[in-house]
Amino acid sequence: MAFRCTLRRLECYRASRLMPYKPSFLFSLISNVNEYERFVPFCQKSKVTEYDPKTGYPTKADLTVGFKGLCETFDSKVVCDPVALTVLADASHHRLFRRLKTHWSIEEASRGRVRVDLEVDFEFASKLHGMMSKFVGSSVASEIIQGFVQQAKIKHKLESENEK
């Protein structure tokens, strides 16, 4: 399920999925920012540049994204909360954006399933980037979460095979 809201040029996209995996497994995938290049559409490179010395979770990361010949690298501040099962990333400080925030959350649902929610709020500083985003904007959250679902299936299968 995906929703869109628009306030001026701020684009807000949300997507949710029910998944049959443990919350801790899903959180470990979402908090592993180094793997984003494997499942986030248009993400060509993802690299954690700072970790919290106490928790080991990322606090800063660089992402390189590309679309239609444009390629940009930007850094994000990352907050991983294993108790609340949330991962927040904010790149609003980067010159490319007026705002870019993502919020992943995980919560128990019914029948042994877990709900994963993704919210992406962004506004480009450049009109050109803003116009380009219209081509992919409406599907961005759905495509990211669909990529995440596929990544979870692959990782879960690998873990299951390693346990044998």
Curated annotation (Swiss-Prot):
One of its GO terms (molecular function) is molecular carrier activity. This is Coenzyme Q-binding protein coq10, mitochondrial. The gene is coq10. The keyword DNA-binding does not apply. The keyword ATP-binding does not apply. Pfam families: Polyketide_cyc. It is a peripheral membrane protein. InterPro entries: COQ10-like, COQ10_START, START-like_dom_sf. One of its GO terms (cellular component) is mitochondrial inner membrane. Interacts with coenzyme Q. Keywords: Membrane, Mitochondrion, Mitochondrion inner membrane, Ubiquinone. It comes from the Eukaryota. GO terms for biological process: cellular respiration; ubiquinone metabolic process. Required for the function of coenzyme Q in the respiratory chain. May serve as a chaperone or may be involved in the transport of Q6 from its site of synthesis to the catalytic sites of the respiratory complexes. It is found in: Mitochondrion inner membrane. Its main location: mitochondrion. Belongs to the COQ10 family.
